[in-house]
Amino acid sequence: MSQKELWYETLHANFGQYFSVENVLYREKTEHQDLVIFENPELGRVMALDGVVQTTERDEFIYHEMMTHVPLLAHGQAKKVLIIGGGDGAMLREVSRHKNIEQITMVEIDAGVVEFCRQYLPNHSAGAYDDPRFKLVIDDGVNFVNQTTEKFDVIISDCTDPIGPGESLFTSVFYEGCARSLNEGGIFVAQNGVCFLQQDEAVNSHNKLSHYFSDVSFYQAAIPTYYGGIMTFAWATQNPALRQLDLATLQNRFAQAGLACRYYNPAIHVGSFALPQYLLDALTTIPKVIGVDSSE
């Protein structure tokens, strides 16, 4: 029996995971990132950037449903949505399922990601790039939110881990720009890593976001591909009531939206905001910082 090729993730120095590779479909080092897509017998097509798995066909729906339907249904009346990152198109796919949304803007730093994902991960976008409400902007996310005069109801930061090009999307200057770019009652969400292994990410995000939003918290979802299992998402708004909607309200909005999901449902929505005690403890011991260094 021939030995299978193995691909090793390099996110963590002392532990990690590997994937068997049936076929490498695409590999290219662009100006910004080292991109690879390969096929795995259990997870389907896998995309990795700079040695870190970003998405797989098998479980991407969990991540994308929770990053979109939680803020959109909590808001209830979103018309304009901004996606930072999301070049694989799956975030756009889920947002576009909400027919009440009038405009979807996506800012992606790397045009190469969009191009090769449309070809090699077509199920992620599922035709959403052709939605007439969609506008693609090739730009740095930090630059966009600090230069635009547009306002949005929901901003979704589909960022990579805070290394390389994704690092700037965890800074105070980015969070400040997002807060300024939201309409009244707007919601900001962002991926914040696997908290059990990357707790500092959540603590740092909470500390910085709290300077610009009066209600900052997190919600979670179980996503097998991401080593450690439980992915944490940052949540920030000026209206704490949006995080505390009752189940009946969410069930009504979910029914009106006509959504059929594979992971998200209103009960999952409510339960996702229940955080483990170790995270609550870490957040309550954050030292108070006087002043904000926008370069951090």
From Swiss-Prot:
Pfam families: Spermine_synt_N, Spermine_synth. Residues 5-238 form the PABS domain. Belongs to the spermidine/spermine synthase family. HAMAP family: Spermidine_synth. Spermidine binds at residues 64, 88, 158-161. The lineage of its organism: Bacteria, Pseudomonadati, Pseudomonadota, Gammaproteobacteria, Enterobacterales. The active site is at 158 (proton acceptor). It is found in: Cytoplasm. It comes from Yersinia pseudotuberculosis serotype O:1b (strain IP 31758). The keyword Chloroplast does not apply. This is Polyamine aminopropyltransferase. InterPro entries: PABS, PABS_CS, SAM-dependent_MTases_sf, Spermi_synthase, Spermidine_synt_N, Spermidine_synt_N_sf. The gene is speE. Its main location: cytoplasm. GO terms for biological process: spermidine biosynthetic process. One of its GO terms (molecular function) is spermidine synthase activity. Gene3D superfamilies: Spermidine synthase, tetramerisation domain, Vaccinia Virus protein VP39. Its EC number is 2.5.1.16. Catalyzes the irreversible transfer of a propylamine group from the amino donor S-adenosylmethioninamine (decarboxy-AdoMet) to putrescine (1,4-diaminobutane) to yield spermidine. GO terms for cellular component: cytosol. Keywords: Cytoplasm, Polyamine biosynthesis, Spermidine biosynthesis, Transferase. Pathway: Amine and polyamine biosynthesis; spermidine biosynthesis; spermidine from putrescine: step 1/1. It catalyses: S-adenosyl 3-(methylsulfanyl)propylamine + putrescine = S-methyl-5'-thioadenosine + spermidine + H(+). Signal peptide: none annotated. Homodimer or homotetramer. S-methyl-5'-thioadenosine binds at residues 33, 108, 140-141, 165.
